[in-house]
Amino acid sequence: MAESGTLPTGFGELEVLAVGTVLLVEALSGLSLNILTILSFCKTPELRTPSHLLVLSLALADSGISLNALVAATSSLLRRWPYGSEGCQAHGFQGFVTALASICSSAAVAWGRYHHFCTRSRLDWNTAVSLVFFVWLSSAFWAALPLLGWGHYDYEPLGTCCTLDYSRGDRNFTSFLFTMAFFNFLLPLFITVVSYRLMEQKLGKTSRPPVNTVLPARTLLLGWGPYALLYLYATIADATSISPKLQMVPALIAKAVPTVNAMNYALGSEMVHRGIWQCLSPQRREHSREQ
């Protein structure tokens, strides 16, 4: 970890400033867009449906990722981690919970959309609430395991944020990684791809699918794939042989996912977009109520 007034190994002054600035921009953009999405759900009755509850879960998870990025950005600009080892464990846990919840919520939204548009039965509240509860409980379970000894949280190469420690590459890390990745990356990615593919096949014959069926899977793959590749490399070789700057790239890419998700799921939905606009325009909302 970089101490106060010193630069992390492998980074120059401008590089540390650049990483901190990028993280800050990603954090603020992700927070602002996802908080607006959450407010639109709370204040717009039309959005209080089981299907939109899944999108709300995704927005909450992405807000958590952005908060995690904000802490990392602040520490990067300070050029040190000011919260101690316990703060590092808490930061790693919170970031891992929200990352897994975001990935699994994306899969839940994909399944919910397929269920809504391609089946005759509507998604009910019991199913939606149970699904959201399962996503968050499962994410908390997997994120807690490194705190209990299966896996480990440690500082990232910049020394100003914390994540799953991949530098050891031992049997403990390898067994945790492959098990966790199957249930929390490969399986959600499979559900997302299959759900939207089935939507294209069923709805494409008669009309254009009402939602973007390509971007969600690409976001999962491109947003979290670099982390998966880095972790996979760490199981077969010494990850420290990769330059510290290159090791930070997956983190910077992943922190952009909340902004992309908000633009796709919220701003890309006419109803959610209308709800956000009503939150930003109180007079318009009052006028709509009078009508």
From Swiss-Prot:
Q: Which residues lie on this side of the membrane: Cytoplasmic?
A: 37-52, 113-130, 197-219, 269-291
What UniProt keywords apply to this chain's record, in alphabetical order?
Answer: Chromophore, Disulfide bond, G-protein coupled receptor, Glycoprotein, Membrane, Photoreceptor protein, Receptor, Retinal protein, Sensory transduction, Transducer, Transmembrane, Transmembrane helix, Vision
Natural source organism: Bos taurus
What are the disulfide bonds? 88-162
An example GO CC term for this entry is: plasma membrane
Q: Name one Pfam family in it.
A: 7tm_1
Per UniProt, what is the membrane topology?
Multi-pass membrane protein
| Similarity comment text for this entry | Belongs to the G-protein coupled receptor 1 family. Opsin subfamily.
Q: In which tissues is it expressed?
A: Preferentially expressed at high levels in the retinal pigment epithelium (RPE) and Mueller cells of the neural retina.
* Post-translational modification summary for this protein: Covalently binds all-trans- and 11-cis-retinal.
The gene is RGR
Instruction: Give the transmembrane region(s).
Output: 16-36, 53-73, 92-112, 131-151, 176-196, 220-240, 248-268
- Kindly indicate whether the keyword Transmembrane helix belongs to this entry: yes
Write out the annotated subcellular location: Membrane
Keyword check for Phosphoprotein: no
What positions does the record give for glycosylation? 172
Q: Which domain of life is it from?
A: Eukaryota
Which biological process terms from the Gene Ontology are attached to this UniProt entry? cellular response to light stimulus; G protein-coupled receptor signaling pathway; phototransduction; visual perception
- Annotated protein name in UniProt: RPE-retinal G protein-coupled receptor
Q: Which residues are on the Extracellular side of the membrane?
A: 1-15, 74-91, 152-175, 241-247
Q: Which residues carry this modification: N6-(retinylidene)lysine?
A: 255
Annotated Gene Ontology MF terms? G protein-coupled photoreceptor activity
**Record function comment:** Receptor for all-trans- and 11-cis-retinal. Binds preferentially to the former and may catalyze the isomerization of the chromophore by a retinochrome-like mechanism.
Q: InterPro entries under this entry?
A: GPCR_opsins, GPCR_Rhodpsn, GPCR_Rhodpsn_7TM, Retinal_BS, RPE_GPCR
